[in-house]
From Swiss-Prot:
Keywords for the protein's UniProt record, in alphabetical order: Amidation, Carbohydrate metabolism, Cleavage on pair of basic residues, Disulfide bond, Glucose metabolism, Hormone, Neuropeptide, Secreted, Signal
GO CC terms of this entry: extracellular region
Modified residues (Valine amide): V116
A single GO BP: glucose metabolic process
Major subcellular site: secreted
Family statement drawn from the similarity comment of this UniProt entry: Belongs to the arthropod CHH/MIH/GIH/VIH hormone family.
Signal peptide: 1-22
Subcellular location(s) of the protein: Secreted
Gene Ontology MF: a single term: neuropeptide hormone activity
Organism (species): Penaeus monodon
Protein name in UniProt: Crustacean hyperglycemic hormones 2
Length: 118
């Protein structure tokens, strides 16, 4: 009976400590705290902080893939970075769009840029 009480008390102490510790991490913005709370740091891997519009993973993925394809065609490092600059609102993105995407889809891609952009 004494062993049971000791285990019960130990369990209560562990739960109380873990709850207090978890609460102390709620206000923390460190990467470790984010992982502990069960949030993935890679959820917004394609997210560009210059994009002030609607966060839409699918649209950002499509726009980012266009830049990746453009880089794969031209193999110039500046293409990959400049294509994504200013949240895809730049001349390099437009050139990649014109080179790789059929003309009837250009307006759709421009609308995507407007949605995720400024």
């Amino acid at each position: 009976m004494t062993a049971f009480r000791l285990v019960a008390v130990a369990l209560v102490v562990v739960v109380a400590c873990s709850t207090t510790w978890a609460r102390s991490l709620e206000g923390s913005s460190s990467p470790v705290a984010s992982l502990i709370r069960g949030r993935s740091l890679s959820k917004r891997a394609n997210f560009d902080p210059s994009c002030a519009g609607v966060y839409n993973r699918e649209l950002l993925g499509r726009l980012s893939r266009l830049c990746d394809d453009c880089y794969n065609v031209f193999r110039e490092p500046k293409v990959a970075t400049e294509c994504r600059s200013n949240c895809f609102y730049n001349p390099v993105f437009v050139q990649c769009l014109e080179y790789l995407i059929p003309a009837d889809l250009h307006e759709e891609y421009q609308a995507h840029v407007q949605t995720v952009g400024k």
